[in-house]
Amino acid sequence: MAEQRIDTQYEDLLRHVLATGTPKSDRTGTGTRSVFGHQLRYDLSAGFPLVTTKRVHFKSIALELLWFLRGDGNVRWLQERGVTIWDEWADENGDLGPVYGVQWRSWPTPDGRHVDQIAQVLHTLRTDPDSRRMVVSAWNVAELDRMALAPCHAFFQFHVADGKLSCQLYQRSADLFLGVPFNIASYALLTHLVAAEVGLEVGDFVWTGGDVHVYDNHVEQVTEQLTRTPYPFPRLAVRPAGLFEHEYEDFEVLDYRHHPAIKAPVAV
């Protein structure tokens, strides 16, 4: 394990957006301060990047990722496990349309077949790890109108070097206070799981944001968060299992020292 240190990249980005962000209107009518184009890089051998300046609910993150990996587009599975983060967008039957997991596991083709992008990437990692085509996309232009919410974290790519698996995510729309801490931890967890599945160590997780914004009704909460001193990142322990067989109980976040949670409204 790399030497543990305090990582302030996320908090520094919050400060940057508050200080330099351009006022913009948005789909929700809330208003934001926005910057365009930013990148964060986390060495996953140095700790699990779970924000410490507020409590982040890891159980919701992990269960949402398992739900994605199931290829599910209905919130019932999440609700049965006490996760309600998608409820605002679901219809009366719990359906969200062909959102993230559906595209990951069952991207429709013009001839009526479906592509399992995750299985495809696993195959390439095993047979051609130097490939530059290990990309998974949730941004299916032909089906955006059927999705309850267009993908914010739109696509990700894997890269292998020196026996280590790295992952880069492109997030076209980044709610920096509420969403991004979830997304960073989710894809860091995914990188751990995929690395274990194909017999690699973890490398870096690279987060790339497009429209990176703080909502106007989150400024007070962000200001409070930035008065807090970050702690070292926790560590992640994962019980061995197949990628598609994992359950939440397989995951344990160790030594997660954090400040109290800060509540804020979700822009729907």
Swiss-Prot record:
Family: Belongs to the thymidylate synthase family. Bacterial-type ThyA subfamily.
Protein encoded by which gene: thyA
UniProt pathway annotation: Pyrimidine metabolism; dTTP biosynthesis
Chief place of localization: cytoplasm
Binding site for dUMP: R27, R132, R133, R172, S173, A174, D175, N183, H213, V214, Y215
Protein's recorded name: Thymidylate synthase
InterPro entries documented for this protein: Thymidate_synth/dCMP_Mease (IPR045097), Thymidate_synth/dCMP_Mease_dom (IPR023451), Thymidate_synth/dCMP_Mease_sf (IPR036926), Thymidylate_synthase (IPR000398), Thymidylate_synthase_AS (IPR020940)
Catalytic activity entry: dUMP + (6R)-5,10-methylene-5,6,7,8-tetrahydrofolate = 7,8-dihydrofolate + dTMP
Ligand binding ((6R)-5,10-methylene-5,6,7,8-tetrahydrofolate): H57, D175, A267
Job description of the protein: Catalyzes the reductive methylation of 2'-deoxyuridine-5'-monophosphate (dUMP) to 2'-deoxythymidine-5'-monophosphate (dTMP) while utilizing 5,10-methylenetetrahydrofolate (mTHF) as the methyl donor and reductant in the reaction, yielding dihydrofolate (DHF) as a by-product. This enzymatic reaction provides an intracellular de novo source of dTMP, an essential precursor for DNA biosynthesis.
Signal peptide (UniProt feature, chain positions): none
Source species: Kineococcus radiotolerans (strain ATCC BAA-149 / DSM 14245 / SRS30216)
UniProt keyword annotations, A-Z: Cytoplasm, Methyltransferase, Nucleotide biosynthesis, Transferase
BP GO annotations: dTMP biosynthetic process; dTTP biosynthetic process; methylation
Self-association state and partner proteins as the record states: Homodimer.
Recorded GO MF terms: thymidylate synthase activity
Annotated catalytic residues: C152 (nucleophile)
Any one of the GO CC terms: cytosol
E.C. designation(s): 2.1.1.45
Enzyme class name: transferase
